[in-house]
Each structure stands twice: as structure tokens, then as C-alpha cells.
């Protein structure tokens, strides 16, 4: 089936299939479980014809793969590639593996770009996979080390490659960490947004820019790879 889905019934019913070549920003406050939300979306309906490339600036590649294993996904038979920007910043000289390629740090955009390109070549050219998903978690970490113009150029390249490959990209941004101009500049690269906000002791999400009107806000919980939505209670 052409296109992609989020694996969240209420949102997928509203959005329909997400067209190939789409890039989305996921933006929300700290501690809103964006990492888990992102991984759950990426893991939805992974098949033999699906490739996933995850740039991790928060945790080592082994921990990312461990999450997928915990969800019952056979890593050895999957097409999952992790660009690990963490391990070598901790002074650990861990080697690359078939599923994990190490960048020296989140500031090493050239190295990160090379590793992403290696996985894209493996999945799209050598294996000729039909679908590719790319995520960067998070852009905010990268922006701590590089200026906006440099990050914009880097993103322009890879959002363009996602479009050219008929893929699906999701890129995480921490709300409240950046000024309005930074967010406005980054938004130019994306087709829409997954917005997250706090509601009391919980968090709610909606999708903006993919249809004529934003979706409704839904509170969410995450159990493993399952995302459970509920409409916020009215005061």
C-alpha cells in the first residue's frame, strides 16, 4: 500500500495515508515521552520491505535497538540502522556494527551525514527496499553545538533525500528551548508537525499541516509500542 501511517488509529482515520516523501517536525515540551512516541511510530508495521534510519543524540545505539527487541522485533532480520552520536562522546571506542554506525558527537554533522548516507545506500540501492523512514532525535541537541544556518543546510539535504526516495521523515524538537525565529526557520523544511502540549499532569498531541484543518487534540499514553489516545476531559 502506498504511503505511510502513524499507527495511531484516531489520527490515521483523520489523515488517511501520509503521502510518500513527507517530512514532519515533532515538537513538544521536555519529559513528554517524545522518544517513546517516535519509536512507536517508526516501529509500526515494519516489514521486510521497510528500512528505518534513526539518528540518536540522546542514548547509545545499543539502547535504541534494545527497545525494538523488547517490542518483539527481530533485529537480526530487520533493516534498522542507528547513527549513534552518544557512545564516543562518553569516551568509549566501540566499533561500528552492521546495525550501528558511530559519529564522533552531535556536532559532527559531516560524520552524521556520511553514516546516514551509508544506511540509505544499503537500504535503497543494495537491498532495493520499497520504503524508508528517517528520524533525528533530536534536532535540539544538535542545535546546542551548531548554529542554525549550518543545521538548516544539513536538514535541507536529508529532507530532500527523503522526498526523493519517497520516504517518511520525523525530526524531534524540544519546545521552549528555541526562540520563535529558530522554530520558524526549521518549519520551512517540513510538510507538517506533530505538536505536543501539557494538559495538567498529562500530555496531548495533534497533527498540523497535513489536512485542511489540524486534527483534534488527544491525550496519549504509551505502552510498549502501542500509543493509546483519549480526548482531553473538558474542565
Q: Model-found features: residue ranges?
A:
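Conserved beta-strand segments of the P-loop GTPase G domain that flank and frequently precede/overlap
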Residues: 25-29, 54-56, 83-84, 135, ...
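Loop/turn-to-beta-strand initiation segments
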Residues: 51, 79, 130-133, 164-172
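Substrate-engagement module of ASCE P-loop NTPases
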Residues: 150-177
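Conserved nucleotide-binding/hydrolysis micro-motifs of P-loop NTPases
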Residues: 31-32, 58-62, 87-90, 139-141, ...
Amino acid at each position: 500500500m502506498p504511503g505511510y501511517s502513524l499507527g495511531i488509529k484516531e489520527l490515521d482515520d483523520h489523515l488517511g495515508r501520509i503521502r510518500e516523501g513527507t517530512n514532519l517536525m515533532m515538537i513538544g515540551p521536555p519529559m513528554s515521552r517524545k522518544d517513546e512516541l517516535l519509536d512507536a511510530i517508526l516501529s509500526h508495521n515494519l516489514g521486510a520491505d521497510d528500512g528505518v534510519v534513526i539518528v540518536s543524540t540522546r542514548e547509545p545505539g545499543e539502547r535504541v535497538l534494545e527497545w525494538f527487541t523488547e517490542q518483539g522485533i527481530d533485529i537480526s532480520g530487520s533493516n534498522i540502522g542507528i547513527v549513534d552520536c552518544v557512545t564516543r562522546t562518553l569516551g568509549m571506542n566501540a566499533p561500528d556494527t552492521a546495525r550501528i554506525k558511530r559519529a564522533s558527537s552531535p556536532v559532527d554533522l559531516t560524520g552524521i551525514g556520511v553514516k546516514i548516507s551509508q544506511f540509505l545506500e544499503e537500504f535503497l540501492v543494495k537491498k532495493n527496499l520499497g520504503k524508508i523512514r528517517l528520524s533525528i532525535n533530536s534536532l535540539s541537541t544538535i542545535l546546542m553545538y551548531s548554529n542554525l544556518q549550518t543545521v538548516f543546510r544539513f536538514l535541507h539535504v536529508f529532507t530532500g533525500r527523503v522526498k526523493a526516495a519517497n520516504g517518511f521523515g520525523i525530526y524531534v524538537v524540544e519546545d521552549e528551548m528555541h526562540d520563535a525565529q529558530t522554530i520558524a526557520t526549521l518549519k520551512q523544511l517540513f510538510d507538517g508537525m506533530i505538536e505536543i502540549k501539557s494538559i495538567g499532569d498529562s500530555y496531548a498531541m495533534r497533527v498540523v499541516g497535513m489536512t485542511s484543518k489540524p486534527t483534534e487534540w488527544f491525550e496519549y499514553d504509551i505502552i510498549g509500542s502501542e500509543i493509546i489516545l483519549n480526548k482531553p476531559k473538558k474542565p
